[in-house]
């Protein structure tokens, strides 16, 4: 059923490290997360590489960026760069 008051879900945002900006208007971002091992309870780092839309080509390798989930832009791009949190040195 549809919501009567037309409420939208809050946008999903994640932070990641730009590892490649060789494509036009696209950056590859490494996103790390921690999961807890089911048996031993130890926290383990897992990482995912995502493609994000960078319309103005402002991002460089090593930048930390904030991304939000959007409707698919291409076959592999479902994220858009919202802001650059930290520049690389």
UniProtKB/Swiss-Prot annotation:
The keyword Zinc-finger does not apply. Keywords: Ribonucleoprotein, Ribosomal protein, RNA-binding, rRNA-binding. GO terms for biological process: translation. One of its GO terms (molecular function) is rRNA binding. SUPFAM superfamilies: Nucleic acid-binding proteins (SSF50249). GO terms for cellular component: cytosolic small ribosomal subunit. Transmembrane segments: none annotated. Pfam families: Ribosomal_S17. NCBIfam families: PRK05610.1, uS17_bact. Part of the 30S ribosomal subunit. One of the primary rRNA binding proteins, it binds specifically to the 5'-end of 16S ribosomal RNA. Belongs to the universal ribosomal protein uS17 family. This is Small ribosomal subunit protein uS17.
């Amino acid at each position: 059923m549809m919501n009567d008051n037309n409420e939208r879900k809050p946008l999903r945002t994640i932070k990641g490290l730009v590892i490649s900006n060789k494509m036009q208007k696209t950056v590859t971002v490494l996103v790390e997360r921690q999961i807890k091992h089911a048996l031993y309870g130890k926290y383990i780092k897992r990482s995912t590489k995502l493609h994000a839309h960078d319309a103005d080509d402002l991002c460089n390798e090593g930048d930390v960026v904030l991304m939000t989930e959007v409707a698919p832009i291409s076959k592999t791009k479902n994220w858009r760069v919202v802001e650059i949190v930290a520049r690389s040195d």
